[in-house]
Amino acid sequence: MQDKPVIVFISTVYPSQHSLLCSHLRANGLADSWFMTMPGHVKLHGPQCDHLLEFQPDGAISGPQSYYYSSKVERSARIGRGLLKALQAFEKRQGRRVDLVVAHSLWGAPNWLYDEIDAAIISYIEFPSFLAHGWDPAFPPDPSQRQADRNMEMLHFHQALRSDLSIVPSAYARSLFPPVLQERIAVQFEGFDIRPQPLKTGTGLPEDPRFTIGFSARDLSTAKGFETFLRLVDRMVEQGDGAQTRFVAIGDAAPNVSYGYEKQWLERRYPGQDLNLRDHFLRLYPRAQVVEFPGRLPYAEFSRLLASVDLFLYPLRHGVANWGLMEILARGGCVLGSNWGFVPELVQHDINGMLLPDHDQAWLDAIRALRADPGRRARYAEAAIRTGQRFHISQVAPRYMDLFRLAMARRRCTAPARLALS
């Protein structure tokens, strides 16, 4: 290995989980780091990023594969074979070996790299399967979807077994794996570069004197707790708490959500109607019509809107980690969160927020108490900013480098001798 390790991050998605880390390691001289992704991303982002590499999957990875029940395996094979060729070509072009590959488990599937390259391999796995992740029982998968989910589970168990190290974003995510595999899995949440903005000041938004209660997620899905938020708003309005209160739900209301099966349920429940989950829930909770839905926003506008919120509700149902929660905390948002899943790993009760059980009255009581206690909200906000600082990329990068060195050491100890590059 060279003094400065050659590290290649891999994902068909860019920007993605480790693109900021890749750039940070390179800019600070910690690694000769590169990001390998699809040609379209290289063409789009290449002028602003000098360390992008392209690879071409061995066939189409979007759309149906040859057999539904093995589609994820087939798609991963196409990605893996394309990666192998691209990595070998990169090593030949550079005249040196890659020391470490850090691959997204599905969008950089490393299953076809084992024993084919000299580099240590780290697999980044969000969660082992949708079965382990969980879904809202009101919107269940079809039997065929449940069976096809075994593809994902098999790929991830294989990676956890064969990779020099696997990384997951939370201890909760690691707990979803069989105990026999957990010792091969490290926990490390991503690094961020989020700059706090004083709440309610300098947001660039029109002044609104009302107390603002917010919900924020990439998509407005049941997994993120969107239904719970609307149900709580409905009850608050019914009980007279809606006066002088502004409610806002930030996120994409499109029917196709990331971690659930709501879209197909909506199509079957409302055939021929262009309805999304928001429309459905507003029929169930009509008093929640007071909620503002700004939709998916450009990042700068999203940041300003977050800064205008006095109290965030984060009633997560299912999930293993979330950028959205860190976006709130790092800016000093006051958070009421679920006391299960990964949330307690970021929110400490009565320190940088509050953790609540799955009981509506507990949430309503906490909302009223915090609304009446600006000093407590300010204390939570200050602690939340410190939480965000702990996950700033400058603080997280050394932890990642420790894990990377561990994986490379394991590779040196266990790999069979291989011929040097000519």
Question: Which role does the model predict for each range below?
Answer:
Residues 60-69, 122-154, 257-268:
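Acceptor-binding helix/loop patch of EC 2.4 sugar-transfer enzymes
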Residues 334-337, 347:
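Short hydrophobic beta-strand element within catalytic cores of glycosyltransferases
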Residues 259-300:
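Nucleotide-activated donor-binding/catalytic signature segment of Leloir-type glycosyltransferases, i.e.
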Residues 316-317:
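Aromatic "clamp/platform" in nucleotide-sugar-dependent glycosyltransferases that forms part
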Residues 204-224, 230-235, 247-248:
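Conserved donor-binding/catalytic core segment of Leloir-type glycosyltransferases
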Residues 1-48, 234-237, 412-422:
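N-terminal subdomain of nucleotide-sugar transferases
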